[in-house]
């Protein structure tokens, strides 16, 4: 049945229960080599209740957000896209920082950039780097979704903060199925 298929896919994607959202599982149907780290197309659209601005996730965390909705497909702006920006925090530290995609990537490890990192943050153990998660600010991404790991720090332009490289999940390069988070109430505009 359809319900069993949804349960199978949710288990496959290992998505946590979120009472304020429902998951709409979608297959990745198109990804252009010229914009591999910028956008992808999914086979769910307006007919399936997909709203513009909705977060897109997989078991490794954030994939991106819906930027264009058609009748049966939608375009996802990826986490690695330099136009995608969001408020983030380091897990266990509630001070907000800014995240943005770094734009051009190779087909290896996708990397983003964290900005406004407090100067007292260090990477003490490279084998256990600080984990970057969504802060919940901004109204699009709920709090606590994994983004990646903070790997390299450097002085920020103002000298008051640091900037750093955020290593994203390698599986972002080969996604075949994702989940769109749709708020039970409200919209994303």
Predicted regions located by residue number:
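A secondary-structure micro-motif
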Residues: 8-189
């Amino acid at each position: 049945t359809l319900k069993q298929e949804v349960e199978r896919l949710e288990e496959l994607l290992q998505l946590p229960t979120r009472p304020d959202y429902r998951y709409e599982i979608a297959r990745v149907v198109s990804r252009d080599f010229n914009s591999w780290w910028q956008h992808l197309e999914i086979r769910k659209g307006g007919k399936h209740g997909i709203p513009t601005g909705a977060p897109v996730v997989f078991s490794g965390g954030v994939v991106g957000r819906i930027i264009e909705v058609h009748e049966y497909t939608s375009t996802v702006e990826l986490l690695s896209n330099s136009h995608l920006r969001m408020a983030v925090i380091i897990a266990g530290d509630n001070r907000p920082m800014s995240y943005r995609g770094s734009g051009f990537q190779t087909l290896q490890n996708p990397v983003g950039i964290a900005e406004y990192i407090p100067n007292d943050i260090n990477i003490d153990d490279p084998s256990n780097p600080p984990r970057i998660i969504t802060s919940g600010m901004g109204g699009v991404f709920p709090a606590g979704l994994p983004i990646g790991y903070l790997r390299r720090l450097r002085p920020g332009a103002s000298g008051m903060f640091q900037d750093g490289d955020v290593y994203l999940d390698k599986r972002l390069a080969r996604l075949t199925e994702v989940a769109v988070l749709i708020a039970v109430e409200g919209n994303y505009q």
